Amino acid sequence: MDVNNLSSNWKKLQETLKKQSASSSSKKRKTSDRETQNVTTKKQKIETIERKKSSLKKKRMSEGQEHGGDESAQEPMVKTISHKSSTATISEQSRTESKPTKVNEGRSPTAEIGKYVAMDCEMVGVGPNPDNDSALARVSIVNFNGEQVYDSYVRPKEMITDWRTHVSGISPKHMAEARSLEQVQKDVAEILDGRILVGHAVSNDLDALLLGHPKRDIRDTSKHPPYRKIAGGGSPRLKILASEFLGLNIQDGAHSSVEDAKATMLLYRRDKEAFEREHLKKWPIRVVVDKKENGEDQKKKKKKKKPRKR
């Protein structure tokens, strides 16, 4: 074997290996550079997304603070409003619920009465048979929008033998600043005069007040046919109607006549057109025809002919 020739071949092999090694390392560097670039790009994208999320979160928080926590304040209302409430009813209820009511305020100095009012009363047991004998202890009236128009505790003339606090919410302490029955009668009569009265079994409330009201001006939710269906044709409870048709949870503990009056008005407003259709069946509109012509108020009476004397 030629040693010189072998040495020459060996050198060529080494040069070839060096070229291949250099080429391989160059490819590795390029691949590594691409991977590094990809990782950097991904990191930049992630950081951009995080920045956007963070800025959006801060913006929402600042908006919530500017509105004074409106979202949290309105959340309970969203839970209470249900499937069958109209948009108008929801918006009006949200607005009136936010307004504070003053217990035993008497006639509100700010609320406008309007054409429609809803009334509810709370009773206490009196006399030797308090389960059957009741007396008026509180009266509440709201307008069409659910704003409190009148609220007053009433001093019964009879001796109270059962406060019914767990139901009525009335206790002896409330009588300290209660108004007399005569004063409340006068106040309520002035409010109801010439207006449409909405109530639930409202005849009981009027009897307790010893007041009357024209039947054509009464809308009673306990007598509304679509609402009576839920009670199998009988008189439905206000609590059931409020839950089923308004999604409102009322009368869980002691009753509030203000709350009940508001629920009653909402029930009327929810189905107002049907209420008025039913009402027209009993009390059709009277059409007055003006028969006055040429200034004559009455028809000329025909003179009777006197029989001739023979």
From Swiss-Prot:
Which CDD domains does the entry link to?
REX4_like
Q: Where is the composition biased (Basic and acidic residues)?
A: 44-53, 61-70, 94-105, 288-299
EC primary class: hydrolase
* Keywords from the named record: Exonuclease, Hydrolase, Nuclease, Nucleus, rRNA processing
InterPro entries documented for this protein: Exonuclease_RNaseT/DNA_pol3 (IPR013520), REX4_DEDDh_dom (IPR037431), REXO1/3/4-like (IPR047021), RNaseH-like_sf (IPR012337), RNaseH_sf (IPR036397)
Which residue windows does the record flag with biased composition (Polar residues)?
A: 1-11, 83-93
Q: Region (Disordered) spans which residues?
A: 1-107, 287-310
Disulfide cross-links: none
Bias regions of kind Basic residues — which residues?
300-310
- Transmembrane helix among keywords: no
The Exonuclease domain sits at 115-277
- Tell me which domain of life the UniProt entry assigns to the organism this sequence originates from: Eukaryota
Localization recorded for this chain is: Nucleus
What GO annotations for molecular function exist for this entry? 3'-5' exonuclease activity; exonuclease activity; nucleic acid binding
The record, for Pfam families, names:
RNase_T (PF00929)
Q: Name one GO cellular component term.
A: nucleus
E.C. numbers: 3.1.-.-
Q: Which SUPFAM superfamilies match?
A: Ribonuclease H-like
Q: Name one GO biological process term.
A: rRNA processing
PANTHER family, per the entry = RNA EXONUCLEASE 4, RNA EXONUCLEASE REXO1 / RECO3 FAMILY MEMBER-RELATED
By sequence similarity, the record places it as follows: Belongs to the REXO4 family.
Q: What is the role of the protein in this entry?
A: Exoribonuclease involved in ribosome biosynthesis. Involved in the processing of ITS1, the internal transcribed spacer localized between the 18S and 5.8S rRNAs.
Stated name of the protein: RNA exonuclease 4
